[in-house]
A protein has these predicted regions:
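Acidic, Mg2+-coordinating active-site environments of NTP-dependent enzymes
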Residues: 1-78, 140, 144-145
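Active-site beta-alpha connecting loops in nucleotide-dependent enzymes
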Residues: 63, 82-151, 155, 179-180, ...
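Short amphipathic alpha-helix with an adjacent loop that forms part of the alpha/beta core around
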Residues: 122-123, 161-165
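Short beta-strands and strand-loop turn motifs
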Residues: 173-177
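Short, flexible loop segments at boundaries between secondary-structure elements
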Residues: 195-204
Length: 204
């Protein structure tokens, strides 16, 4: 896995192997390590010090709503992947957090259809999750029957059910895979509501 990046007249083939094995990033997943490798190669071409680059990468907290770790509730790690509004993005989130051979992810997904076939998510969801809470919507209608999932008319109810099913050591992933139309004003409203709900639980 690699990408070409052009630096002036130089074209370099970059993959994640150029990063130190012990470099821990806040955002999990091989795709995020590849992004970091691209950033490293560009910064190194500007003659910046490797140690400073890697220190900055290790301290980078990530981007809000993109596999963002926002805390723990009763030993359950919570990731906010609200900006994943396509099936492909939700698949990437699941694969980033999945542990081989274990189904330790509790997933909250669902929403409004946006002209992308959502059925591509079904196999990955089945392999990686122990419980799925879906937000009602036109996209959810296309996958609900294929999944052993509960459908909810509010995000609050979905989070409540997901946390009730999760156990210490599990991961709760909020990765909608669909648009926010209908239940929310926009995706920013959806993001803010999720963070507010989790903050309330974490404070208990």
């Amino acid at each position: 896995l690699g990408r070409k990046v052009t630096l002036g007249q130089e074209v370099a083939l970059v993959d994640a192997s150029i990063l130190p094995d012990d470099l821990l990033l806040a955002m999990p997943g091989e795709h995020n390590r590849l992004n970091a490798a691209l950033a490293y190669r560009a910064l190194a071409a500007l003659n910046l010090d490797d140690e400073e680059i890697f220190e900055a990468m290790a301290s980078f907290p990530g981007v809000e709503g993109r596999l963002q770790f926002i805390g723990e509730v009763n030993g359950v790690r919570i990731y906010n992947d609200n900006n994943s509004t396509t099936p492909q993005a939700t698949i990437a989130g699941l694969e980033a957090l999945a542990v081989d051979g274990e189904r330790k992810i509790v997933l909250i997904a669902g929403g409004a259809y946006k002209n992308v076939d959502p059925t591509m998510m079904i196999d990955v969801i089945d392999r990686a999750t122990k419980y799925v809470a879906l937000l009602a919507g036109t996209g959810t209608d296309l996958i609900a029957e294929e999944l052993d999932a509960d459908v909810f008319d509010s995000l609050t109810a979905a989070v409540e059910s997901a946390l009730a099913r999760a156990e210490a050591g599990d991961t709760l992933l909020f990765s909608p895979g669909f648009a926010s139309f209908g239940m929310f004003r926009n995706e920013y409203d959806r993001n803010d509501q999720f963070v507010k709900i989790i903050t309330t639980y974490a404070a208990e």
